[in-house]
Amino acid sequence: MPSTPLPDDVETLKALLQQRDEELQSLRQTVSTLELALSVRTLEIEQLTLQIAKLNRMMFGRKSEKIDKKLEQLETRLEDLIAEEGADEQIDPVAAPPRQKSVHKPFPENLPREERIIEPQEDACPQCGGNLKPLGEDVSEQLEIIESAFKVIRNVRTKKACACCDCIVQAPAPSRPIQRGFAGPGLLANIAVSKFADHQPLYRQAMIHARRGVELDPATTGRWMGACGVLITPLVEALHRYVVASGKIHTDDTPMPVLAPGNGKTKTGRLWVYVRDDRNSGSEEAPAAWFAYSANRQGLHPQSHLAGFAGVLQADAYAGYNKIFIDGSVIEAACWAHARRKIYDLHAKKVTPTTKEILRRIGELYAIEAQIRGQPPDERKRIRQLQTRPLIDDLEVWLRNRLLTLSTQSETTKAINYMLNQWHALIYYCDNGLAEIDNNIAENQLRGCCLGRKNFLFLGADSGGERAAAMYSLIGTAKLNGIDPEAYLRYVFTYIADHPINRIDELLPWNITEKLVGQIH
């Protein structure tokens, strides 16, 4: 672009310089304003992210519509702020303020690739007209999604007749997951995962399918899920046997509203989870999660679920477990996360020297666990005896001394007494390298169920709770083993009807990983 000729007159030049100085100053002020706005927005995003994380921690395990509403508001605001950044870049990529570049992991190798060769439009050099020769190429990848599509599989069984007699031959009809049902195994797996993993009620799924021109009545898909629950019963029982054969089990439970028959009101059922997962102590045995439903929270249910189990039971301080520990074959290990949460809730309301100090000391215990994660049990026990035990002994003395200075009616006193009342179970993990510092392994398995409870509002009947527990068992175990639950259920629904019942263990997730190559996370 040619430069504008400068005038010869000195006064005119001075005026021009003055004008440009003023324009430059204005631009600097604009840049400063934009930088300030960007800083404010970046700070707001960081604050929103922290608040959302905090509310997520607070939301689990308690009923709070205020927290849910606040969380939704913050997430919506955060989405809007991030969307504004994307809109700014889309409108003017050059003028958009710089931001920290997102680093994404390479796309999985098993994803299909569609290569598009983009050739230059020029056939000859645009400057001199010379011939063009290959120089190299620039490659960029874009992630796209292809809409899942329905298809109809027509099984045509031809008949053949003997030319010499009346004999007719025909291949047997292929088995179906559901007798006289028209749903294929892939469709059944998709419906099950959409409901129990993605928390989409059947009526919402019906609306989604209707947009694609396929009418699937929720009553029909509901019957399919009932039939699938029966189909997978032997497999879920095998999973149960595998879990209770472990030397350590993590357990937890959560309420499940259930529609009471006759009066239209809801009662409170219970969903229990029992997890076998020793990977933190270096085990290569497959992790597994078995869920069970009960109509109430009576202690007889976990006693029945754990019949035949001997080992360490990591749980909260629920009194319903007490009878399990009586004969000594099952040893109680408590959860430091539960104990810490009671202190943290008080600390979040009002920071005090007591709550601050307790959280700091518990943080030291967790720091040691982070260092020994994945080590064999003997090494974990050695480090805990050397480093953790002195800290815990000192913490106990400090807590008991602190109680002498606190009101017996204070919330802090109650939280400290909660810890001291189960102190033996809390410190047990120091003496057993297989045990964990907390019960988060079980709590994590229940998070998805809590999301589903929020979407479904209630279960239709106790039988619905039992079906949900069965599906949660297979889906949760598939996830623990890094397997796509939909791919796993598709395989199960394809073969389980014809699979020998005495070899049902062959269909457990870790036994079919080689058959699901490309679908392991």
Model-predicted segments: where are they?
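Catalytic center-proximal scaffold of phosphoryl-transfer enzymes
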Residues: S3, Q18, Q25, E46-Q47, ...
